[in-house]
Design a protein with these regions (language model features):
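Generic helix-packing signal
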Residues: 9, 45, 100-101, 133, ...
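Short beta-strand segments
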Residues: 7-9, 57, 112-115, 144-148, ...
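Generic anion/oxyanion-binding catalytic loop in active/binding sites
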Residues: 27, 85, 196
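Conserved N-terminal catalytic core of the sugar/cofactor nucleotidyltransferase
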Residues: 1-7, 14-18, 22, 30-115, ...
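Residue-level signature of transmembrane alpha-helix interfaces in integral membrane proteins
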Residues: 27, 69, 75, 131-133, ...
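Conserved core of the sugar-phosphate nucleotidyltransferase
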Residues: 120-210
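Extracytoplasmic/periplasmic beta-strand context in beta-sandwich domains
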Residues: 26-27, 157
Length: 210
């Protein structure tokens, strides 16, 4: 199936102030390499098969900055969707899905939703997880990516999964918003709780029908 990356780049990056500012938030900064976090997000998709032009969802004030950074890495076939005001991720993802359907790009395509400010080192494992997710999405599933927790972090949401694995994936039992310290420690002791990465794979019509 075709893969249409959807890059969520609307964050304000206020937690990294003063390095990250409202008009120049962290996703546009080069923090771990000579490329910005937005650019790295797209470049780490190199090597995957059937990648289509990406959709970048961003704040209206950042539209020219996004276009400039995409041009710098030779991404010329992109779509930039503008948010007049910052909202949470759900409306941004829905807008991207509607755009794909309206532009008649949906046929045999999945959306790969990624945040523009993630740091991912193990690209091989990342690509493997994406390919597993695509196989699941072919069966009209909405797939999310969990991260194995390394500490009882209360800054992340968590995913509770079933114990049984099927084709490299687990069934989601529930999503838990940021827990308190005691609850986070309990999650860390179990093997079926993961940090919610905010990354997804699905067919556009499946999300809209939800």
């Amino acid at each position: 199936m075709k893969i249409i990356p959807v890059i969520l780049s609307g964050g304000s990056g206020t937690r990294l102030w003063p390095l990250s500012r409202k008009q120049y938030p962290k996703q546009f900064l080069a923090l771990d390499s000579q490329k910005s976090m937005l650019q790295e997000t797209l470049l780490r998709l190199n090597g995957l098969s059937n990648i289509e032009g990406p959709i970048v969802v961003c704040n209206v004030n950042h539209r020219f900055l996004v276009a400039e950074q995409l041009n710098e890495i030779d991404v010329f076939d992109s779509t930039i969707l503008l948010e007049p005001v910052a909202r949470n991720t759900a409306p941004a993802i829905a807008a991207a899905a509607f755009n794909v359907i309206q532009q008649k790009r949906e046929g045999k395509a999945v959306l790969l939703v990624l945040s523009a400010d993630h740091l991912i080192k193990d690209i091989k494992a990342f690509h493997k997880a994406i390919n597993i997710a695509i196989e699941c999405a072919k069966h009209e599933k909405i797939v999310t990516f969990g991260i194995v927790p390394t500490e009882a972090n209360i800054g992340y949401g968590y995913i509770k999964t079933s114990k049984s694995e099927k084709n490299g994936a687990f069934k989601v039992e529930s999503f838990i918003e940021k827990p308190n310290q005691i609850t986070a420690k309990k999650f860390l002791e179990k093997d079926n709780y993961f940090w919610n990465s905010g990354m997804f794979v699905f067919q556009p019509h499946v999300l809209i029908n939800e």
